[in-house]
């Protein structure tokens, strides 16, 4: 729900008493935003609950429809409720955005740098600032024309000077414009993305002889400077490794005209060529390459490392090469401790462990410690291996005897504890005479009693008859007339009478229901007869 409609709905709820005179049945035809189902339901609610209660349902249903405020205002005017319509319209307009009345501003193109001259020339050129860093330019693409070329660089530079500014610019003796590095940096802002797009388009038509075929669109630039970034337009089919100095010859042929800018352009061309061709650097073991000749993408060091590259015979004295994209360590291989895994790169080559000072990478160091003595591997960590005890040999090497001895020695203490004399004693019992179905857990008072092997049924009594078990002691009055020793002071029975009175079973039989009714009837008759006899005696 928009903000204005939400505020209008809350205003109507707060001032609901002002809308009580709105007839729901009358206003429904003026609300086309409501569906037929909504209108039928509201009419039924108005018939059952009345008009006032139905107004709540009407506003609740309206606020779910888009644009309901305009429909409601028009419906109020149709029902001749102009005051309410104006009130709702004023509230609705007060919450409308302020800028919605005026048309939106036309879209303006993004602002351009202040140094940009008038309309661009037919072709866009490339230029590099003095610090070899490309500046930003507008994000929209620049028009590029590949086929049309100006007559001469002198005329193009003169036209660009006239369009840019009337100030005087020094010229070379041969007529070409000469600019400083600050002017070039201000007049040639180009992004790397723009260079990549235009390099791919201009690379197909550019040749080594066309050194000044394009003119800059942002000011006069010398032909040599404008040509420097186009060093990447050479064919990229040759991927063979070569020296780092083998850059495009056209990129360095114009270094005599402008030394500072040409060197920056040549460096940029070298970086582009190295990133595209990914040429590896090959250094001999005796000489070191200069630091500025290494590309930025090769994390190698200048120290000669006695390692062997992939698919190269393992001869550290004759060949010591470093792959261009494999990071190598600056420390010699002899400093690698024996307890660390070796580099997995030269894993499939036979390496002389005595010369290289390291074990082959196929054998883990943990296996070397167990199968090879420390004297055969002349590494720096050999003294460490001599101090530490050797790991136990595997069971396969000794026929499994060492593993069995270790396990037996570990369990020797536990076995001696379990077999102490006098703690655990075995007892031979008589064989069981019953069946397995009679087995059960029976309660025993003490552990020293002998086992009972009788059937379990003997421990229970039959429940064929009902009996009353008397377990209370006889009173002292019953024992006064009986001969014998006196009773106990606690009131207990005498020893002779213990069997008679301690437990006595009195059998009782359940009477039938007919006998009970007969006894009750006989008793009633006797009572009535007795009452009649007594009544007659009183009368006489």
From Swiss-Prot:
Residues 95-297, 314-358, 373-419, 476-507 are annotated as: Disordered. The record marks 148 as: (Microbial infection) Cleavage by CV3B. The record marks 429-430, 490-491 as: Cleavage. Residues 2-513 are cytoplasmic. The modification Asymmetric dimethylarginine is found at residue 236. Keywords: Acetylation, Antiviral defense, Host-virus interaction, Immunity, Innate immunity, Isopeptide bond, Lipoprotein, Membrane, Methylation, Mitochondrion, Mitochondrion outer membrane, Palmitate, Peroxisome, Phosphoprotein, Transmembrane, Transmembrane helix, Ubl conjugation. Changing residue 155 to D: No interaction with TRAF6. It is a single-pass membrane protein. GO terms for cellular component: mitochondrial membrane; mitochondrial outer membrane; mitochondrion; peroxisomal membrane; ubiquitin ligase complex. The chain crosses the membrane at residues 514-534. Residues 10-77 are annotated as: Required for interaction with NLRX1. One of its GO terms (molecular function) is protein serine/threonine kinase binding. A lipid is attached at residue 79 (S-palmitoyl cysteine). Changing residue 159 to A: No effect on cleavage by Seneca Valley virus protease 3C. There is a cross-link at residue 461 ((Microbial infection) Glycyl lysine isopeptide (Lys-Gly) (interchain with G-Cter in UFM1)). Following activation, phosphorylated by TBK1 at Ser-442 in the pLxIS motif. The phosphorylated pLxIS motif constitutes an IRF3-binding motif, leading to recruitment of the transcription factor IRF3 to induce type-I interferons and other cytokines. Ubiquitinated. Undergoes 'Lys-48'-linked polyubiquitination catalyzed by ITCH; ITCH-dependent polyubiquitination is mediated by the interaction with PCBP2 and leads to MAVS/IPS1 proteasomal degradation. Ubiquitinated by RNF125, leading to its degradation by the proteasome. Undergoes 'Lys-48'-linked ubiquitination catalyzed by SMURF1. Undergoes 'Lys-48'-linked ubiquitination catalyzed by MARCHF5 at Lys-7 and Lys-500, leading to proteasomal degradation. Residues 496-507 have a biased composition (Basic and acidic residues). It is found in: Mitochondrion outer membrane; Mitochondrion; Peroxisome. The record marks 148-149, 427-428, 508-509 as: (Microbial infection) Cleavage. InterPro entries: CARD_dom, CARD_IPS1, DEATH-like_dom_sf, MAVS. It comes from the Eukaryota. Residues 106-122 have a biased composition (Pro residues). A motif (pLxIS motif) lies at residues 439-442. Self-associates and polymerizes (via CARD domains) to form 400 nM long three-stranded helical filaments on mitochondria, filament nucleation requires interaction with RIGI whose CARD domains act as a template for filament assembly. Interacts with RIGI, IFIH1/MDA5, TRAF2, TRAF6 and C1QBP. May interact with FADD, RIPK1, CHUK and IKBKB. Interacts (when phosphorylated) with IRF3; following activation and phosphorylation on the pLxIS motif by TBK1, recruits IRF3. Interacts with NLRX1. Interaction with NLRX1 requires the CARD domain. Interacts with PSMA7. Interacts with TRAFD1. Adapter required for innate immune defense against viruses. Acts downstream of DHX33, RIGI and IFIH1/MDA5, which detect intracellular dsRNA produced during viral replication, to coordinate pathways leading to the activation of NF-kappa-B, IRF3 and IRF7, and to the subsequent induction of antiviral cytokines such as IFNB and RANTES (CCL5). Peroxisomal and mitochondrial MAVS act sequentially to create an antiviral cellular state. This is Mitochondrial antiviral-signaling protein. The lineage of its organism: Eukaryota, Metazoa, Chordata, Craniata, Vertebrata. The gene is MAVS.
